[in-house]
Amino acid sequence: MDAIILCAGKGTRLHPITESRPKPMIPIAGKPILEHIIEKIENHVEKIYLVVGFEKEKIIEYFNENPKIEYILQEKQLGTGHAVLTAKNFIKDDFLVLNGDVIFEDSIDEILDYENAVALSKVDNPENFGVIELGYDNKVINLLEKPKKEELTSNFINAGIYKLQNSVFGILENLVPSERGEIELTDALKKLIEIGKLHGVELNGYWNDIGHPWDVLSANSHFLNKIISKISGKIENNVSITGNVIIEEGAVIKSNSVIEGPVIIKSGSIVGPLAYIRPNTILMENNFVGNSSEIKGSIIFENTKIPHLSYVGDSIIGANCNFGCNTITANLRFDNKPVIVNIKGKPVKSVRKLGAIIGDNVKSGIQVSFMPGVKIGSNSLIGANCLIDSDIEQESFVYKKDELVITKKRN
């Protein structure tokens, strides 16, 4: 049996983090979402076909040494069904299909027992997903895409993991494209439901559909809480390390710094002196966190510099960023209500604590503050003394004009 993992989409709801990388390559607890998925299935399959598109080179470069993996290019993203069809000539038997942005802990053993099956997750907000209704013997009897609350008949949702027979390719080829001109895998599932040939299998462990920035932070926190301490880097005098902490070889923790796990600090990173790294934080390769700076509950991508007297909380900071002294990310509203984030032009309630979401190659001057939930597009420059309270598009230059009054000193 082989597997198909769908990795071609642009992940626009996760901009600016996905402006320059595929969503499956976002790191969760130090490794890409896609690597987590592959680790769950690679012992069950002979070949893994990654359907790639946007920024495909970053996926290929990372996984190039895995002999089980082959790549299929989806030149135009015309739906999940179309993505599966691109693998038709490579699949000769039953196969798995997985969305490249779902992260889960449960074994897939049970789903393999059926000819056609979809994994299910039980959630509190099923109206935001494709809802699955089960009948006798775990047969799927209905699938509703993002129904209204009054239409809900189940708390089970489509978890984006499927085991299918080869014959599903024939169903996909005969589907009528949607109004958007796309061929959707869920439409093929509905055909299987009509003939009573689709079963549902509940996932009992952790599952997360990484669709929003706060989902990234939530998943990161969950998997960081599974790590086991391993200190391989250089630790200077008077450093306090508590909880489970991984410090890779080549990392340096300078004197009088405090690290509270779960935390991962990857190779080449320098922390301190007098820095404070709080729980649920990951510093990717070659980061710098300077004197008297504090990082809490955040993901800091590689080659980023957060210098002295700065605070980054509940934030995602892209690669190759360089902040000025006293950069602050606010992460909490006065009224303690969920932070509102602009997602594809619409205000969306996120979580109670959320800082800034900053793309790659962003530079800020001294004393820049970011209000909760703001997004800063890649390759932007933020001038000194700015308070950023709204989203900034990529390739922007933001600066503040203050009138400087100069007069002669009176005797």
From Swiss-Prot:
Pfam families documented for this protein: Hexapep (PF00132), NTP_transferase (PF00483)
Superkingdom of origin organism: Archaea
Residues involved in acetyl-CoA binding: A384, K401
Entry annotation: catalytic residues: H308
An example Gene Ontology biological process: UDP-N-acetylglucosamine biosynthetic process
Region N-acetyltransferase, annotated ranges: 225-411
Binding positions (N-acetyl-alpha-D-glucosamine 1-phosphate): T80, G130, N142, N158
Annotated catalysed reactions: N-acetyl-alpha-D-glucosamine 1-phosphate + UTP + H(+) = UDP-N-acetyl-alpha-D-glucosamine + diphosphate; alpha-D-glucosamine 1-phosphate + acetyl-CoA = N-acetyl-alpha-D-glucosamine 1-phosphate + CoA + H(+)
EC number: 2.7.7.23, 2.3.1.157
Keywords assigned by UniProt, alphabetized: Acyltransferase, Multifunctional enzyme, Nucleotidyltransferase, Repeat, Transferase
Region described as Linker: spans on this chain: 205-224
Pathway: Nucleotide-sugar biosynthesis; UDP-N-acetyl-alpha-D-glucosamine biosynthesis; N-acetyl-alpha-D-glucosamine 1-phosphate from alpha-D-glucosamine 6-phosphate (route II): step 2/2; Nucleotide-sugar biosynthesis; UDP-N-acetyl-alpha-D-glucosamine biosynthesis; UDP-N-acetyl-alpha-D-glucosamine from N-acetyl-alpha-D-glucosamine 1-phosphate: step 1/1
One Gene Ontology molecular-function label: UDP-N-acetylglucosamine diphosphorylase activity
Binding site for UTP: L6, C7, A8, G9, Q74, G79
Span list, region Pyrophosphorylase: 1-204
NCBIfam families on file: Arch_glmU
Purpose of the protein: Catalyzes the last two sequential reactions in the de novo biosynthetic pathway for UDP-N-acetyl-glucosamine (UDP-GlcNAc). Responsible for the acetylation of GlcN-1-P to GlcNAc-1-P, and for the uridyl transfer from UTP to GlcNAc-1-P, to produce UDP-GlcNAc and pyrophosphate.
Family: In the N-terminal section; belongs to the N-acetylglucosamine-1-phosphate uridyltransferase family.
Protein name according to UniProt: Bifunctional protein GlmU
Protein's organism: Methanococcus maripaludis (strain C5 / ATCC BAA-1333)
